[in-house]
Structure formats: structure tokens, C-alpha cells
Amino acid sequence: MQKLNRSFKISNEIKKKISWIICYQLCDPRLFNILISVSSVNLSRDFSYAKIYVSILNNKNISFKEILTILQNSSKHIRYLLAKGIFLRIIPTLHFCHDSSYVNGTKITNLINNVLYNK
């Protein structure tokens, strides 16, 4: 149980730090005016690998795949900045994934509204 609690605390701390890094320290002009939110972080058992789920609100004509590619290409720099801000023996390798839960939730809400109001 203690291992799970530690894993939860570390993943939350990594989530906070990566959110801050993406928002304030990642200076890629292609990511300006794009809201990137870190939804969750899944760590491997030995904390050497982290899967980061991001939600993206896009005002530009950039696809989700392009944004994820930009983040993945910047993952070494993000990992370096993460190592400066968090004190762990092993800083995990970062892998970014698109979190589609917001889009799926919106679709389900629209379907429910259509059923309820279009009788």
C-alpha cells in the first residue's frame, strides 16, 4: 500500500511540474495560443517510464498528432527541466499521449441531450 501511495504522490508532482514546464518554459512558437493541459501521468513500477496524457484545445490549424510530435521531440528538454525541479533518483522517460476523455464526454452528453429533447 505504501508503494501505491508513493507512486500516486510522485505522479501528481510530475503532473504539476510538467504542466508548469509546458506552460511557462517550453518556448516553441508553434505552441503559442494552444492550451495544453496535463490530464494524468501513469508511472511504471520502477518510475523509469511515464506516460503523460494531455488534453489539447487548439485555436490554430495544427492537428493533435503534430502537437504530440512537438511535445515528444521536446521530451528530452522537458525531462531535463523536470530533473531540475524534482528530486528523484530516476527521472522517468516521458511519452506523451492524447487524452480524448473530454471529446468522448462531449459526444456522450450530446447523444443524451438528443435522446432527451428530441422525442
Curated annotation (Swiss-Prot):
One of its GO terms (molecular function) is ribosomal small subunit binding. Its main location: cytoplasm. It is found in: Cytoplasm. Keywords: Cytoplasm, Ribosome biogenesis. It comes from the Bacteria. GO terms for cellular component: cytosol. One of its GO terms (biological process) is maturation of SSU-rRNA. One of several proteins that assist in the late maturation steps of the functional core of the 30S ribosomal subunit. Associates with free 30S ribosomal subunits (but not with 30S subunits that are part of 70S ribosomes or polysomes). Required for efficient processing of 16S rRNA. May interact with the 5'-terminal helix region of 16S rRNA. Monomer. Binds 30S ribosomal subunits, but not 50S ribosomal subunits or 70S ribosomes. Belongs to the RbfA family. This is Ribosome-binding factor A. It comes from Buchnera aphidicola subsp. Baizongia pistaciae (strain Bp).
